[in-house]
């Protein structure tokens, strides 16, 4: 009887351990987290100093994080108010970006894949974006076509935004980054 | 009642202990046991020791997640067992080109952009520590005054891959970016044995 109890305890522990591992990796948790407003990055994932959780994740998902000299990447799953991004709402991504040679903003599925849309636009590069006279920009993330910089959502039921800064002077190791260093994501109208 | 309660707590502690152990071990061995990691996916598309252009990132046709659709990407898988790998790039355009050197399990041990080029060229030799020692011993002291024209990188493991990225800032530059990453030469060398 005691042996069975011991075995059950071990089995329950193993199952729970695998469950926790899957959950942690799916949620991209790690000790190495940089945050600026809704944007989250893992600046050490492009070095040999990579966090063990990020290391396990890249083995599992096969993603190729940017090398530290290549640039930094950030993912936003929420808007600047903290609410999850909803596919039936419009969002305005606006503001400035730290000194960087190029940046790109891409719309991805929660697992990091591109989402098909009729306009065949999957993101913007800093060169493509139409800017205001003061150099700031506004990108509208919406399901239906908008004038100006429109990033289509397609038929996605959930999505995230990915911001990549290439050849950037921003260094999360030495600088504290405020919420307004990266673009704001403001919710507009909802269908 | 209290005895039963404490014995339940004990079993619960046992479950949590085993779960924690399994979690830590699973995280640590994941890079070694993952079968569908980046290297495995790239190895299905590319031959070792040569530059292979990866298919453009489009919905439903992505080799790896979190690819930037604005980039053309090429890969060179290497195995340094028989000798170093020489990576040579001519970058005449002012296009953003980044090169990352990764281990078999996908960690970046060195990365650079076209800004690190010397008169528009990049020359990198990846080698193991014994190979570097052999090259330095062969060179002796004779040309110590000459600045090195190449970057010598010691790779953590014999196996790994080099990823070359070029940005097409506008869709019209896609063909140019693809041609540029494809033109990066990646040549395995055999060390002269004496």
Where are these regions (language model features)?
Chain A
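A compositional/structural signature for long, glycine/proline-rich flexible linkers
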Residues: 1-191
């Amino acid at each position: 009887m005691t042996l069975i109890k011991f075995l059950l305890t071990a089995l329950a522990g193993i199952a729970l351990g695998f469950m926790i591992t899957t959950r942690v990796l799916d949620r991209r948790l790690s000790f190495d987290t940089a945050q600026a407003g809704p944007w989250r990055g893992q600046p050490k994932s492009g070095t040999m100093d990579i966090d063990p959780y990020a290391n396990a994740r890249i083995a599992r998902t096969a993603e190729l994080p940017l090398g530290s000299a290549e640039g930094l990447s950030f993912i936003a799953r929420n808007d600047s108010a903290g609410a999850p991004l909803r596919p039936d709402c419009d969002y305005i991504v606006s503001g400035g970006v730290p000194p960087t040679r190029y940046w790109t903003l891409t719309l991805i599925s929660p697992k990091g894949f591109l989402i098909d849309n009729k306009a065949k636009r999957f993101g913007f590069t800093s060169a493509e974006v139409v800017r205001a006279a003061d150099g700031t920009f506004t990108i509208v993330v919406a399901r239906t076509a908008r004038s100006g910089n429109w990033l289509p959502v397609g038929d996605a039921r959930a999505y995230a935004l990915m911001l990549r800064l290439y050849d950037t002077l921003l260094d999360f190791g030495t600088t504290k980054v405020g919420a307004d260093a990266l673009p704001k994501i403001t919710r507009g109208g909802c269908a | 009642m209290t005895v039963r309660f404490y014995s339940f707590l004990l079993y619960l502690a046992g479950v949590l202990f085993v779960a924690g152990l399994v979690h830590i071990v699973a995280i640590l061995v994941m890079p070694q046991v993952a079968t569908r990691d980046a290297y495995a996916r790239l190895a299905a598309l590319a031959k070792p020791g040569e530059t292979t252009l990866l298919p453009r990132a489009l919905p439903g046709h992505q080799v790896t997640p979190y690819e930037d659709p604005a980039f053309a990407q090429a890969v060179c898988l290497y195995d340094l067992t028989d000798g170093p790998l020489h990576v040579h790039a001519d970058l005449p355009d002012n296009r953003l080109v980044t090169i990352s050197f990764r281990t078999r399990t996908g960690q970046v041990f060195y990365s650079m952009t076209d800004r690190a080029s010397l008169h528009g060229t990049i020359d990198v030799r990846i080698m193991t520590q014994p190979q570097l020692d052999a090259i330095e011993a062969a060179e002796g002291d004779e040309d110590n005054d000459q600045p090195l024209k190449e970057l010598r990188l010691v790779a953590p493991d014999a196996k790994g891959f080099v990823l070359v990225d070029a940005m097409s800032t506008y869709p019209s530059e896609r063909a140019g970016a693809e041609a540029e990453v494809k033109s990066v030469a990646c040549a395995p060398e055999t060390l002269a044995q004496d």
